[in-house]
Amino acid sequence: MKRELKPDFYYKYYIYASGVKSAVESFRFVLDAEIEEEKLHYAVGRLLQRLPWLSLKPYITKEGRLNAYADAVGKPVYRDDGSRCFLGSKDTQGYLFYVSFKEHEIWLRIGHSLSDGRGMMLICQLLLYYYLEARYGSIDDEGLLNAALKPD
C-alpha cells in the first residue's frame, strides 16, 4: 500500500520525467580500483535504509494533485552506457536520484528537490563509506563524519 506524503511546497516534480531542464546535481568519484557492481548495489541499499526520504517517488493523483510515496523497491544503480536517464521516470525506477558507474568512476546524480548542498554532501559521504566498507571491510570512521551522523 502506498503511503501518501504531501510535499511541503508545490515543487513540480514532473519536470524530472518530462525531459526539460531541471536542477540536478552531479557528483563524480574516481577510485584507484575497478568498481564492483554488487558492492555498489549493497552501498545504495544501505543508503536507502539510512536515509529513507531518498526513496520518495512522485506521482499525480486522480484529482491531479502532486503527491509522493515512499517505496524502496529496486535500486537505482546502472552501468554507465552513455544514455540519458530522467529522474522520477521509468529510467530510474521512479527515484529522484541514481548512481551510475564505469570502470573506476562512480557518478551520483540527485534532484535538488531531495536535498540542499549540505544534505548532498552527507549522501556522498555515506555512499562512499558504504561502498568502501563493502569492498574492503570495516573502516575506522573517526574523523570521517560528525559524531551525530555516525554510520549504523
Give the positions of each predicted feature.
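Non-catalytic N-terminal regions of enzymes
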Residues: 1-152
